[in-house]
């Protein structure tokens, strides 16, 4: 297909922002929602432990392919090395949110492998099980949720707990189920989600917009929204500042 065209300033991190402060806004949201759902957090609850950033290299030909420009503009010359443009679109950091440790990583390559697009990988490790979302070739690049019991948990008790949890979710999400994983899937269980509930990444933006418009109509929002937003951006700025130290 045709490449997604971008304005030239899209590759200026001073205007567009670096990767470590871009997509990470959504990922930090996910950590907060999953680890502390509907709980008010404070910036003092978050401490970044390590952070780094690195660049993706764009050749002049690649830049022209996605912008239509035959050369790098003057305002990007400070990011040109050996004739190529270095874009700090990648970053990762580890941090502690209250008593939960989390790692956030964003990688932007110029082009995804054929047949793929944006992909997401996530693991939540608990004392009794791990929940992992994989979106690789085996999953046909669609997100799939796996459940893996912890080594010290009895298999029978684990199955009972999994089936009880799925049964409770079925009340809100009819059709959701679980099946035993295959050897290749390297897990105990696979959560199966019907097509009508598997709405995809883009539909999530509409859902967020619907929530915002509802808050606007009602003239209020949950008490945790504002403090958690402040905590999110404070966390990201800690990571941004730490990633630049020593450069």
What are the residue ranges of the model-derived segments?
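C-terminal helical cap and adjacent loop that interface with cofactors, partners, or active-site loops
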Residues: 15-44, 88-95, 99-103, 110-247
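Predominantly a Rossmann-like dinucleotide-binding segment in NAD(P)-dependent oxidoreductases
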Residues: 1-84, 212, 246
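Glycine-rich, charged/polar anion/phosphate-binding loops
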Residues: 77-79, 106-110
């Amino acid at each position: 297909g045709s490449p997604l065209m971008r304005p030239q300033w899209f590759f200026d991190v001073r205007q567009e922002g670096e990767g470590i402060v871009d997509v990470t806004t959504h990922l930090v949201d996910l950590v907060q929602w999953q680890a502390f759902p509907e709980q008010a957090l404070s910036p003092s609850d978050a401490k970044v432990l390590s952070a780094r950033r690195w660049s993706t290299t764009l050749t002049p030909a690649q830049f022209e392919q996605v912008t239509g420009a035959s050369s790098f503009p003057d305002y990007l010359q400070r990011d040109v090395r050996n004739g190529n443009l270095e874009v700090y679109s990648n970053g990762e950091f580890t941090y502690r949110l209250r008593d939960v440790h989390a790692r956030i990583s964003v990688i932007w390559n110029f082009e995804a492998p054929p047949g793929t697009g944006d992909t997401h990988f996530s693991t939540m490790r608990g004392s009794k099980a791990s929940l992992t979302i994989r979106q690789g070739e085996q999953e046909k690049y669609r997100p799939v949720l796996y459940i893996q019991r912890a080594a010290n948990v009895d298999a029978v008790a684990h199955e009972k707990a999994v089936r009880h949890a799925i049964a409770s979710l079925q009340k809100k999400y009819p059709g959701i189920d679980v099946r035993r994983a295959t050897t290749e899937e390297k897990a105990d269980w696979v959560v199966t989600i019907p097509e009508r509930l598997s709405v995809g990444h883009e539909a999530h933006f509409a859902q967020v917009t619907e929530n915002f418009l509802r808050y606007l109509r009602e003239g209020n929002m949950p008490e945790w929204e504002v403090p958690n937003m402040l905590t999110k951006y404070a966390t990201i700025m800690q990571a941004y500042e730490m990633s630049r130290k020593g450069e």
